[in-house]
Amino acid sequence: GRDAYIADDKNCVYTCAKNSYCNNECTKNGAESGYCQWLGKYGNGCWCKNLPDKVPIRIPGPCR
C-alpha cells in the first residue's frame, strides 16, 4: 500500500473538514487509517495511510 490522497474516478480528492470522515473513507477502502489534510496541495483533502494499490489516488493533472 501507499500513503496518498485518495481520489474518486475523476481524479478529485475527497474534500473534508473532519478527520473522522476521512478515516472512515480510507479504512473502508482498505487503508490503515486516514485524516483530513488541511490546506494541502489540493485544498482540504483526505490523506490515507497504507492505501491498497488498487484504489485510485490523486495524481498530477486536473480534477475533472
UniProtKB/Swiss-Prot annotation:
GO terms for cellular component: extracellular region. Expressed by the venom gland. InterPro entries: LCN-type_CS_alpha_beta_dom, Scorpion_toxin-like, Scorpion_toxin-like_sf, Scorpion_toxinL, Scorpion_toxinL/defensin. Keywords: Amidation, Disulfide bond, Ion channel impairing toxin, Neurotoxin, Pharmaceutical, Secreted, Toxin, Voltage-gated sodium channel impairing toxin. It comes from the Eukaryota. Its main location: secreted. It is found in: Secreted. Disulfide bonds join C12-C63, C16-C36, C22-C46, C26-C48. The modification Arginine amide is found at R64. GO terms for biological process: defense response. Negative results: does not show effects on Nav1.2/SCN2A, and Nav1.3/SCN3A voltage-gated sodium channels. Does not show insecticidal activity. The complete amino acid sequence was obtained by combining proteomic and transcriptomic techniques. This non-amidated recombinant toxin slows fast inactivation on Nav1.1/SCN1A (EC(50)=52.8 nM), Nav1.4/SN4A (EC(50)=32 nM), Nav1.5/SCN5A (EC(50)=116.7 nM), Nav1.6/SCN8A (EC(50)=46.3 nM), and Nav1.7/SCN9A (EC(50)=147.4 nM) voltage-gated sodium channels. On Nav1.1/SCN1A channel, acts as an agonist by inducing a shift in both the voltage dependence of channel inactivation (alpha-toxin activity) and activation (beta-toxin activity). This is Delta-buthitoxin-Hj2a.
